[in-house]
């Protein structure tokens, strides 16, 4: 899991790479996004604004997409662990790009302005004590992306 302190730092770290630039464009478009409505750029990037106050019971893992969270309001704990240290509860489904696991991991707390990138070799679960508002992006892991954009 990568935690980046703010959007400017994200821009500097990921200055090259079209898919990361598209993430910044999506985040900058949040004033035009209704909560809960998903938008996409082909199948290489999807994004939505959500307000979340639920705690995940299980860890979630992905294989084809990084999950990126940009926090707009509030703070949230995230428990994460390498997938190989967790026990599979529901096997990976290609249709959803998800697998569910259980176990114990390391916990971090993130807050407004920070960006979290969930790596595909790890699984994570979000722990909420209060509602958080964030932009959730799913970004392809593939190198060949956004050819027509």
From Swiss-Prot:
**Which InterPro entries does this one have?**
NanQ/TabA/YiaL (IPR004375), NanQ/TabA/YiaL_sf (IPR037012)
Q: Name one GO biological process term.
A: single-species biofilm formation
GO CC list = cytosol
- Cite the Gene3D superfamilies for this sequence: YhcH/YjgK/YiaL
Q: How does it assemble?
A: Heterooctamer of 4 alpha and 4 beta subunits.
- Cited function: Required for full activity of the EbgA enzyme. Exact function not known.
What the entry lists under NCBIfam families is as follows: PRK10202.1
Question: In its UniProt entry, what is this protein called?
Answer: Evolved beta-galactosidase subunit beta
Q: Which organism is it from?
A: Escherichia coli (strain K12)
Lineage per the UniProt record: Bacteria, Pseudomonadati, Pseudomonadota, Gammaproteobacteria, Enterobacterales
This protein's gene is called ebgC
């Amino acid at each position: 899991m990568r935690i980046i302190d703010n959007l400017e730092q994200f821009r500097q770290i990921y200055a090259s790479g079209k898919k990361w630039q598209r993430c910044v464009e999506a985040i900058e478009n949040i004033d035009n996004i209704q909560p809960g409505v998903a938008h996409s750029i082909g199948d290489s990037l999807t994004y939505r604004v959500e307000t979340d106050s639920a705690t995940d019971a299980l860890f979630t893992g992905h294989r084809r997409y990084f999950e990126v969270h940009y926090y707009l309001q509030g703070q949230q704990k995230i428990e994460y662990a390498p997938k190989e240290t967790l026990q599979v509860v529901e096997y990976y489904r290609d249709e959803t790009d998800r697998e569910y696991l259980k176990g114990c991991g390391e916990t971090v707390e993130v807050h407004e302005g920070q960006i979290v990138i969930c790596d595909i070799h790890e699984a994570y679960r979000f722990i909420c004590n209060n509602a958080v508002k964030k932009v959730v992006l799913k970004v392809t892991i593939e190198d060949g992306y956004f050819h027509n954009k």
